[in-house]
Amino acid sequence: MIKSELIDQLAEANPHLYHRDVERVVNTILDGITDALARGERVELRGFGAFSVRHRPARVGRNPRTGESVAVKEKHVPFFKTGKELRERVDASRESNPEIA
């Protein structure tokens, strides 16, 4: 699912709201999560999961095309840890529908 599909699904489930208002709400939520992560804060959505920022130290990588060594700078990256309810729900759906890979 992509963001526009999420917006469409939410707008369909809430016909009393205008599509543009649903889009504005989704964008505001995502902007809030992004801003909090940019400040180094942790964002927890109980039952769904938690977003945080992790430090990746500098390392030596390889260019896959040429095989030459390349210095990769240290950086901070977003990290998501799933919540217990989300893990259990996904696992249950896989057990009841084994053709999902």
UniProtKB/Swiss-Prot annotation:
A Pfam match: Bac_DNA_binding
Keyword annotations from UniProtKB, A to Z: DNA recombination, DNA-binding, Transcription, Transcription regulation, Translation regulation
The keyword Transcription regulation is assigned to this record: yes
Biological-process GO terms, alphabetical: DNA recombination; regulation of DNA-templated transcription; regulation of translation
Coiled-coil features, chain-numbered ranges: none
MF annotations from Gene Ontology: DNA binding; structural constituent of chromatin
Superkingdom of this protein's organism: Bacteria
PROSITE patterns linked to this entry: HISTONE_LIKE
GO CC annotation: chromosome; cytosol
Keyword field contains DNA-binding: yes
SMART domains from the UniProt entry: BHL (SM00411)
Record PANTHER family: DNA-BINDING PROTEIN HU, INTEGRATION HOST FACTOR SUBUNIT BETA
Role noted for this protein: This protein is one of the two subunits of integration host factor, a specific DNA-binding protein that functions in genetic recombination as well as in transcriptional and translational control.
Family: Belongs to the bacterial histone-like protein family.
Assembly, per entry: Heterodimer of an alpha and a beta chain.
Name of the protein this chain belongs to: Integration host factor subunit beta
Organism: Maricaulis maris (strain MCS10) (Caulobacter maris)
